[in-house]
């Protein structure tokens, strides 16, 4: 009956809100999400259904798809080559590995010659790590010059790409253990030099609300165009 159907729907809504909070989703986002599904979940056809709980699950699934984006958006290559793309994120997010994987994807699926460039002069062996990953994936890597600053590496990369025929340059920026003023100032300077068509944030999905806060900080500093969530298979 109607009262039983309503009870089932309200119970599901409470469970959904609790599940989101336990998954480290912020209270604001959890409330907003439940409020979005509430009008549909309380619709007459749902209440009168023989299985209102299952119909609520479908509504939640549809809303999650809508929230995350129901359409695939391709990378933007709409610029005069070499096209620059900037990878940003905190240290340990998997940014360098993602940079190499993205380079391989572009070469294989988009048939474009890619060069990867490490701007991380702070983390020990960070530049060597990208060089090794480039060799493993057969991707061209900008040669390392010890002591060169990120801004100068950017300018050298742009010149090198024009000479070696690279159509896309992926710049792997330095990460930090936490966001600080120096980091953001450096990334802003890099953005001004390379004028990237894509600025992609790489974030660890297991950090929960931290990832959302990091995204806000980067969005306030640079023209963030996309996000890659690592470790999302767990």
Locate each region found by the language model.
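Nucleotide-state-sensitive switch-loop elements of NTP-binding domains
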Residues: 22-88, 93, 97-214, 222-225
């Amino acid at each position: 009956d109607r009262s039983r159907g309503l009870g089932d729907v309200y119970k599901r809504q409470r469970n959904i809100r609790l599940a989101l909070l336990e998954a480290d989703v912020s209270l604001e986002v959890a409330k907003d999400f439940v409020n979005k599904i509430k009008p549909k979940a309380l619709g007459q056809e749902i209440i009168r259904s023989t299985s209102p709980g299952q119909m609520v699950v479908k509504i939640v699934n549809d809303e999650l798809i809508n929230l995350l984006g129901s359409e695939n958006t391709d990378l933007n290559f709409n610029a005069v080559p070499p096209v620059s793309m900037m990878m940003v994120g905190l240290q340990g997010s998997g940014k360098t590995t993602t940079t190499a994987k993205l380079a391989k994807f572009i070469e294989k699926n988009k048939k474009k010659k890619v060069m990867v460039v490490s701007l991380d002069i702070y983390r020990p062996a960070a530049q060597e790590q990208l060089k090794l990953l480039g060799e493993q994936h057969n991707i061209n890597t900008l040669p390392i010059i010890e002591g060169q600053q990120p801004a100068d590496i950017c300018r050298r990369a742009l010149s090198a790409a024009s000479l070696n025929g690279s159509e896309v340059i992926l710049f792997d920026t330095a990460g930090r253990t936490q966001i600080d003023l120096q980091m953001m100032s450096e990334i802003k300077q890099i953005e001004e030099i390379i004028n990237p068509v894509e600025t992609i944030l790489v974030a660890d999905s297991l950090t929960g609300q931290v990832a959302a806060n990091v995204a806000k900080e980067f969005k306030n500093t640079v023209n963030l165009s996309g996000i890659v969530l690592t470790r999302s298979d767990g």
